[in-house]
Amino acid sequence: MNKGNTLDSIPTDLILEIFSRLSAKSVGRLRCLSKLWRKGEWFFFSSLQPQNLYEKPFLVVAADFHMKFSEDMSHDIYSYASGLIYFPKMLIENEKSGAIRVICNPITGQYAILPKLITLQAARSFLGFDPIDNQFKVLLVNNDIVNNDMDILTLGIGELMSEKLKFIEAKCFFALDDVQLINYKGKLGGISWNNHEVAPVELSMWVLEDVEKQEWSKNVYILPKNVVPNNWLHAAGVTVEGDIVFSEAVVSNPFDVFYFNPEKNTLQHVETHCNHEVFDDENLVNIFVDHVEDLKFDVMKPTYAATSIRPTEQKHKPTSTETSMSRKDHQVRTIDQPQQDRCTFESINNKFDVMCLLDDD
């Protein structure tokens, strides 16, 4: 088996053997990425997500350490999508081109290097997964106020074609300082909450009910102050059951995670314990939910890298596609990028192909 690049010393075949012997329930976990302030290092942990959240008023789980990321990474924003983590600036041994954009599988340690772009080198970028076309995409947004062009990198295999993108107006967010977009049961949503020490946590949630008419619904919830500490909270996302997950923005031992279900108006407190030095200090932390449940292994195979909804019958070659567009006219141009460093991403997907057997249990 082609291992591809790896950040980890554990052999790929051994990891595949371990995962193939586990049930899907055993693998479904809450992921945690913690940054050690004093050294600039990143640590990756996971803990089992409780299957029956609301049977008990209080739950305790354990977190397991998986791997450590390079301390030479930039402090720039990273992002997470369907089991992969994207770092916009990472220094890798034997790479002479300086900081590069990398997509990494934090469980196996494998990574894929994205092609360099001449334009938008200073742009902010984010990783996402398109479940319709089964593609991973990286969005690059220019920081320049005058030139607000955007680039989209699509990972996969296929022919180059074009697509039309449509923007959704969200005027309900304009007056807010901070809104986090979420996937709420298949609908686009946004949440905002106050981080004040005096008042209880007030959570506002908007859901796009009609895409064509661009109609949003809004609900406001008050989280009980005696359960949720009113210090700085981080929203991890939404589980497949519709629970909004919050955690403390700074790690502690024990580490508190909160599940709030808007439909049932229920709140669950989960206490996470870990025997690791990272949890002993006040380090930054971000968590991700439904690591396996959101990871559709069967659709993470290399797919058509172009933006075509209907794949052609021709023989396909591996590509990495750059799609550039402007907010003003929504026009799209597509540029074929060189085939460098593509085999590493295929090896990541090969590992997912084997792990998809877990869904059959």
Curated annotation (Swiss-Prot):
InterPro entries to which the protein is assigned, alphabetical: F-box-assoc_dom_typ3, F-box-assoc_interact_dom, F-box-like_dom_sf, F-box_dom
Domain F-box: 4-50
Region (Disordered): 308-339
Superkingdom, taxonomy of origin: Eukaryota
PANTHER family for this protein: BNAA05G37150D PROTEIN-RELATED (PTHR31111), F-BOX ASSOCIATED UBIQUITINATION EFFECTOR FAMILY PROTEIN (PTHR31111:SF130)
Protein name, UniProt field: Putative F-box protein At1g33010
Species name: Arabidopsis thaliana (Mouse-ear cress)
